[in-house]
Amino acid sequence: MAIQFQERDKIFTLNTEHTSYQMKVDNFGFLLHLYYGGKISGSMDYLLTYYDRGFSGNPSDAGNDRTYSLDALPQEYPSLGTGDYRSSALVIRNADGSECCDLRYVSHEIRKGKYGLPGLPAVHASQEEAQTLEILLEDVTGGVQVRLLYGVLENMDMITRSAIITNRGGEKIIVEKAASACLDFPGGEYEILSFYGRHAMERNLQRQKIAHGNYRIGSRRGASSHQYNPAVMMVEESATEESGRCYGMVFVYSGNFLCEAEKDQYGQTRLLMGLHDELFHYPLERGETLAVPETILGYSGEGFGELSRRYHRCIRKHLCRDICGGQPGPILLN
């Protein structure tokens, strides 16, 4: 099976033909990211490190254990107000004005086929071509539930991610920021490849080092636009077209978007993709839901040329609607 769950250690492993993605639920119920890269066969939880780090706060659950801090641990869907001072995937403003959302694991479901997102574009696949993992997280105090959706297209070497946010509390909340995907990396020197442009000169490649601090690209135009492309690659410094580790994020949405790459004080890197947090304040009354547009994740250990080709194959077959039976389509005037 493409999706496996180890009950004893509470570890999820998502496998494609050449890649693996792994995460675990820890003893406090937090969903931690373990690994994304070339295919593996065992547990990668040995990559989690615990040190007493000054000025990195500890949750009350940890008691006197000063080595446990969300400010340094890799997470699947980090939220503001939990002691993690890096960029957040989710920011909720509660009815009392506070901005805190303490998400803990509740349950999960593994099923055949690819999840859908009503009213939004998304990768599509048959029951035999994909599997879905749905993980339910909840902030018990505020009543916020987040369903993390993972679609695994094994033969395409692609994993899709989305999040559905629901207000189960008694009062209205405001979603101030919502990403669909977050990747945390424990160390290493990386560069980010992005594409900028202007009228009549779109899609210019830019490659730059991810230094300490926060790097952001996005659109506030109401459309993904010619200015920046909602697709990035994060690559090791030595990566070329033919060699090197490369990670990709493609946002399946034509509106405002935001991609962030942040290197923290410990040399860890976080990559986020989702809706732009400026000009975005989404109210949710009790029972209402917000679905965050999908991000397609890709990995290649053979350079960004191979990663590009994997995206091409996946998008042509599973995102574009083929109305011509594989034949060339009619001429389109621009």
Predicted regions and their residues:
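Hydrophobic faces of well-ordered beta-strands that scaffold small-molecule active sites
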Residues: 21-23, 292, 329-334
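Short Pro-Gly-centered flexible turn/kink motifs
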Residues: 91-93, 98-107, 282-301
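Polysaccharide-binding surfaces and accessory modules of carbohydrate-active proteins
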Residues: 5, 10-13, 17, 21, ...
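Short, Lys/Arg- and Gly-enriched loop/turn segments at beta-strand edges
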Residues: 298-310
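Short acidic, Pro/Gly- and aromatic-enriched capping/linker segments at domain boundaries
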Residues: 1-12, 265-285
